[in-house]
Every structure is written in C-alpha cells, then in structure tokens.
C-alpha cells in the first residue's frame, strides 16, 4: 500500500502521494525551489496516523514546477432600465507543486 498524506494549504485540504503534481493557491516561491508543508492532517499507508488536529513531526516536501493563472472567469452585472452595465474578469493565480517526500 502506498503512503499518502492529507495536507492543509491555501485554506483547503489536499490528498497527496509521492510523485503527484498538485495545483494549490499561489505560494511565494520560484520555480525549482523546494517547499515544505508542515500542516499535515493525516498520514496513511501501512499504519494510518490521524492528527488531533495535526500530525506531530510530519511534513510533506515538494518542488515548485511553475506559477500560473487559471482561465479567466467573467462576471457581468446588468441593471434593467438604468443603462448600467459592468463587466469584470478575474484570473486566480496558482502554483503547481510536485510532491517529493512524505516525512512521518
């Protein structure tokens, strides 16, 4: 059974395995730089360890592959009979991280 972990990042919980690429909210790191996720909620595999609320001493290490922005989401507001129109676009930034190790 392969080892996996559930980490908290960007206000979300993400299940990760070694070698997996994940997309998370933007991190302040450049491409090629290593990042460590210390907020580990669960480590699973042979012996599953559930944190209360976090697993003590556990961490997940990954490498930033790239920074980017998601596809544009367009919002359009319209008020009838008032001649009021408003169009706004938003592109959420993200970071692509490849998981290298799960330290339990």
From Swiss-Prot:
Q: Does the keyword Kinase apply?
A: no
Coiled-coil spans are: none
Which SUPFAM superfamilies does the record cross-reference, listed alphabetically?
A: L21p-like
GO biological process per UniProt: translation
- Molecular function via GO: rRNA binding; structural constituent of ribosome
| PROSITE patterns for this protein | RIBOSOMAL_L21
**Keyword terms, alphabetized:** Ribonucleoprotein, Ribosomal protein, RNA-binding, rRNA-binding
Assembly, per entry = Part of the 50S ribosomal subunit. Contacts protein L20.
Q: What function is annotated for this protein?
A: This protein binds to 23S rRNA in the presence of protein L20.
Listed HAMAP family: Ribosomal_bL21
The text of the family note is:
Belongs to the bacterial ribosomal protein bL21 family.
Q: What is this protein called?
A: Large ribosomal subunit protein bL21
- What is the source species? Streptococcus sanguinis (strain SK36)
Tell me the classification of the organism that encodes this protein: Bacteria, Bacillati, Bacillota, Bacilli, Lactobacillales
